[in-house]
Structures are given as C-alpha cells and as structure tokens.
Amino acid sequence: MYQIIKENQIFPNHVLEYRKDRYFYYVLLDGKRIASFHITINTRVGSLSVKLQDADDLYELLNRIYQFLINRYRLEKVTYSDSNKEIREELKKLSFYAKGKILQRVTDPYRLLCKKGTFDEEGFIVRQDNTDVIPFGLFNSKDKGCGWIAAYNLLHLNQINLDIYDVSSSLSQSDFFFSAFGESVFLLYKMLKEKLPVKFLSHTEKQICNRMRNSDCGILLYYHKHGAHFTMYRKIDADKYQFINAVYGRKLVLSPEEFMKKYTILHIGTIIYM
C-alpha cells in the first residue's frame, strides 16, 4: 500500500527549509520509505524534485506522485528540472515533454473542471457522476460517458496517457447517433484495437467469466436494472479483480462470478480484454 506523508508528520520538529511555497513529502510502500519529494508552487505551477531510496517500480511511483499533486493542489502545470536520466525517461511515459532543459506536463483542463474525487490516487476516473462538465456527443459524460471513461482508464493502466477530449471526442464523433444511446461497444473496440492488443467476446455470463480469468485487464459491458454499463477491470490476484467506476467512488474487488451475480440482471455480456 502506497502512502504519501508530509515531512512534518514524520518529523514534526524538523524543517528542512522554511518556505511557504515549498512542501516536503515522503513516499512509503507497505510502511517502508521508498522516496521523498518536494514541490515548489508558484501560481498553480509546481516545480517537482524527487529523491529515490528504494523504488522498484519507478513509473508507478512517479505516477502516484503526479496524481497526488494534481488532486491535492489542482496544479495547472508540473515541471521537472533535475538531471536524473532514469526519472526523466519515466516522466516522458507520463506525458511530460521537453521544453528547453526542463520537462513539463500541462494538466488536462477538463480534469481541473471536475470536482475533487473524480480521479483517484492512480489517475483513474472513479466518479462518473462528477463528469457532467465533460461533453460527450450531444450529451454529458455523467449520463452517457461510461464507455469512453472505461477506455480512458484502460489506456492509462497501460501507460497510454491521453487527454480526456482526445478519448471522448474520438468515440462520440464516430457515432452516427451522436452518443444518444451511449457508447457503441464496436466503436470502442475499434478505437482500442488501434492502441492495444485487445480481443473481443460477446457471450454468456459463464463464458465472459472464463475469459476474464484468462486476462489481465479489460473492459466489461454488462446490464443492470438501469441499463447497460461499461467498467474497466484489472486482475489483482489469481481469483480477484478490481472493477473501476462500476460503483462510483468505490474500488470493487471481487471474483468475476461474484461481480456478475451481484451487479448484473442479464446472463450475457461483452468483454474487451488483454
């Protein structure tokens, strides 16, 4: 379990450098310190510096730090100017780009329009009910956006970090009905197939569960009492999967059979999987 803790919470009487615009943090994984960082904020632009102690998954660590900074401080831009080549390469995977000698990432403007809590600590959209400010076709994402949200989350899981508009508009603009009936599962599959090695199956609940067990992640289209819904899933261990944006704000961890039994009313579904 990752934890990001302010420096003065661990050492309340120890101040590294007193500045009102600079904040120091430690990153712990299962209680062990793996990194520290500080952020200097000037008018919603944050300058980041990171020191590594024992980080095995550097991309995951930097993603957690970045998501924390955007969620906590609502920064419009984050910059990185240190010379650590390993960190710089991983930040590029997080959509940081070079501007002179620094790397920077400008925060997606639609993300800043959404309420706090819309994105979780890993950068997944977990509160579709907060996305009414994001258009989707002739509608808004709160009512019709579960398909593109599932696609956005799956791409983010696989280190493809696109802007919200790039994902939502690419799906809504290719829909003949302007998203009046939500997202077409076939258009969703077509778009994802261009970026990821996904496969497709529409079948019975039993076959869907069997296929899910042989995949690491994907998108499930299922049917509940209010209609159809897309959710992204990923494998946690041999028998448990995490379902993102199935129940808003909650990270459900269930077996495929448990999920289908509890949340579906029809014994059929569609899966886009890897």
Which residues does each predicted region cover?
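Short hydrophobic alpha-helix segments
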Residues: 8, 37-38
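Short amphipathic alpha-helix that is part of the acyltransferase structural core
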Residues: 1-19
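Conserved beta-hairpin
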Residues: 23-36
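Conserved GNAT-family N-acetyltransferase fold
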Residues: 35-37, 48, 231
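Active-site-adjacent structural segments surrounding the nucleophilic cysteine of cysteine proteases
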Residues: 108-177
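Conserved catalytic-core motifs of GNAT/GCN5-like acyltransferases
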Residues: 97-109
